Amino acid sequence: MKKFLNAVIVLIAFYSINIISQDEVEEIVVTSAFIDTSEINNPLYIIDGTEFSDGATTSLGDAIDEYLGVSIADYGSAVGQPIIRGMSGPRVKILKNGVVNRDVSGLGVDHLNDVDLNDISQVEIVKGPSSLLYANGTIGGIINVVDDLISTKNFEIPEVSVGYESQSVNDGNSEFVNLKGNVGGFNVNFGYKNTDFGNYDVPSGAVIHSEEEHHDDEDHDEDEHHDDEHSEEDLGYINNSDFAVEATKFGVSKVTDWGYIGFGIDNLESVYGIPFHGDEHGDEHGDEHGDEHGDEEEHEEHGEERIFSTTDSETFSIRGSYNVNGSLVNKVDFTYRDSDYSLTEAHAEEEHHEEEDHEEEEEHEEHAPTVFMNEAVEYGATFDISNDSSTQKVVVNFVDEDNSIVGEEAFMNPANSEEFTIGYYLSKDLGTFDLDFGFRLDQIERSGSVSEEEHGDDHGDDHGDEHGDEHGDVDYYNIDDTTSSFAIALGRDLSDNLGISLGYASVERLPSSIELFMNGPHMATGRFEVGDPNLNSETSNNFDITFNFDNGDFYALASFYITDVDNYIALIDEEDDHMDEDEHHEGEDEHHEGEDEHHEDEHDDHGHGNLIHANYMQEDAEFDGYEIEFGRSFDLGSGELALSFGRDVVNAEFADGHYVPRINPARNIYSLVYTQDDLLFKLMLKDVEKQNDIGEGETATDSYQMLNTRLTKTFNGLGKGELKVSLFANNPVSYTHLTLPT
C-alpha cells in the first residue's frame, strides 16, 4: 500500500512572559538513575526542548525520526513507535525523567507511546546496549524525555507561556498554556495542551490498496477488487487518520540546602483512528469465502468501518534527593511512580449522514470494545558513593506491573511482572583513557497463563455448543529468572580535534509478557499471534567504535557497530499454514453455503481463517551497521550557515542466512541550518532507499524522499515578554511510499 502525505503548513504563536530577564544559560546534562553528566562514552543525542515546541505536534517517533540511527514504526498520525539501530519493541525503552514509561505500547504496534511532549527540557537518545544504565533489557537503546515538572532548582521568576498551532493537512489545531513560579517557597509547575487533528488530506488516487492474493483461483474477483480500490482512491483523505489528545500536568517541589523533594501528576487522554487496519485484510478474505454481494450491499448501507482507540492515563510521581555528606555516601536520589493506564480499542460503522454520527457505536454491537490496562508501581534509590578519583553510584529499583486485556480481542490473559534491580556505575580518568563501566543484576518474575482453544468440535454437527465451550484447558506459568548485564567504554583524545571511543556490552533480556503469553487474534495487525512460555532469554554482545572530529568550523563523526544476539525473539508469519487454513475454510463454505450469515461469521471467528498465523520464535541473529555524519559552518551575512550530511545503515540476518523481518532501510539525511540573531531557518531532506533485504513473507519497500522546512522568528522588545512564530512545511513536494502492516 502507498500513501501520500500532503504538505503541512503550520503556524505556531508562542508567547512567553518573564518578569525579569535571565542571562544565565543552564548547562545541558544527561540524566538517569545512574549518571547525571555526559560522562559515558557512547553514541548519544541530547535534543533541546525547543526543537519540539517550535516544530509541529507529532508522535514521539516522528519528532526524532531525522536523527541518525533512529527511525519509526508508523501506524498513523498518532502512533510512531521508535526504532533504534533496527531494534524495536521491548528492546527500546521510553523513559520519563529517567523512569520507564509504563503504558501499553508494548502490547501492540498500533498503540501510541503515552508521553506528553509539552514544555519538555530535552530528549536524550542513547543508542545501543550501553543504555543498560537506564533500564533492563535495552539492547536497542532508550529515549528519555526530561522536563522540570518536579523542579530540582528554585524558579527565580514567574513565567507564563501560551501557544497556538494550526495544521492545514488535517484541518487541525493545538493550544497550550504553561505556568511556572515560586509560591511561598514552593516551586509550582502547571501545563496544559489540547490537540485536535482531523483526517489527513491526500490527492485523489493517492491511497492504493494492494492486498496480496492467497489463492490461485481468485482471478474472477479482480474486477470487483479494483472497483473497491477506485472508491478508496477518490476519498481525498486517509480514513481513520485523525488524532485528538488532551494533556494536563501539575507539579510542586521544595528545594533546600539538604536537597529537594516534590510530586507530580500527569494526566493524558486521547482518541485516535487506526488507518489501514487489519480488519480490511480479514474482510477481503471474508468476501472471498462468503457472500460477496451481500457484503457490498452492507458496505453501501453502512459506509466505511471505523476502528479507533481511546486512552486514559494518570501518573503520580514523587522524586527527591537528600544530601547525606557522609564518609561513604554523599547523597541519595529516590523516586516513586504509580501509573494507571487504559486503552480501549473499538470498531464502528461510519454513517454517511452526519446526524447519525452519535449512533456509530450502536450500529455494530458484535464489535465489542477491547480494553488494555496496565497498572504499575515503581520505586528506587541511587546512592552516590563518588570520591575525588572517580564517580561511583549504586542503584536499587523495584517494579510491580499488571497487564490485562478484556473484551472481544483479548489475545492475552492477565499477567504480572515483578522486577528487582541492583546496579553499579563507575567513571574514572585513567590518564591515557577515560573509563566508564556499568553492571546490573535483574531478578524478574513473570506470572501468566495461556488458554488453549479447542477447535475439534467447532466444525461438527453440534454448532450450538461452540460458544459454551470455546476454550480448553488453561495452563499457568510462573517464570522466575535472574539476568545480568554489563557495559564498558574507553575513550581517548588522539589530538586536540580527534577523539575515539570503544565500547563493549553484554545485555541479557527476559522475554516480555506478550512474547510469553500472547495467544489470540490481533485484528489491528490482521494476525493470530501466539507466544511461547518456554522462550529463553535473549543475550546480546555488542561492540562499537566511534570517531569524533571537530576543529570549530568542520566536524565529522563515524560510528560502527556489530551486535550478536543469541536467541533473538521475532514474530514470524506462518504463510503456508495460513494458506492451508484458508483453503480448508473455503471447502467448508462451499459445503455449508446454504447456512445463514450468522453461522458463517461464527465459523470464521473460531477458525481464525481470516488472520495470518504468527508465532514468537527464537533464532540467533546478527545486527551490524554504521552512522556517519560530517558538516561545515560558514559565516554568511550577519548570520551563520551550517551544512551537514548523514547516512545510517543497519543490516540484520538470522544464523541460517535469511533476513530479520521489519528492518528499516538505509537513509541519507541532508541538512541546512541558517541562524541570525532571532531568526532560524532549517531545511532537511531525508532520502530513504529501497529495502530489498526483507524477511520471509514480506514485500519490498520502495524508496522515497521527504523534505521538511521550518522558519522561526523571535520578536523581542514586547515589554517583559517575547513572541515566537514558526512557519513550517513537512513534505510539501514529495511523495512518500510506505509499506503498511498487512
Where are the regions a protein language model picked out?
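Flexible loop and strand-edge segments within Gram-negative outer membrane beta-barrel domains
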Residues: S241, V245, G259-V332, D338-A376, ...
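Short acidic/polar hinge/loop motifs at secondary-structure boundaries
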Residues: V100-P129
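Short, acidic, small-residue-rich periplasmic hinge/interaction motif at the N-terminus
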Residues: S21-S53, G89
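Conserved C-terminal beta-signal and adjacent last beta-strands/turns
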Residues: V8, S21, N182, S241-T248, ...
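Outer-membrane beta-barrel translocator/receptor signature
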Residues: D119-Q122, L132-I208, D242-E246, D257
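Surface-exposed extracellular loop regions of Gram-negative outer-membrane beta-barrel proteins
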Residues: D340, Q443-D457, D461, D465, ...
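Transmembrane beta-barrel wall of Gram-negative outer-membrane proteins
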Residues: N170-D196, H209-P275, F308-V329, S386-T391, ...
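Gram-negative outer-membrane beta-barrel transporters
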Residues: T432, Y561-V565, E574-D576, D580-E583, ...
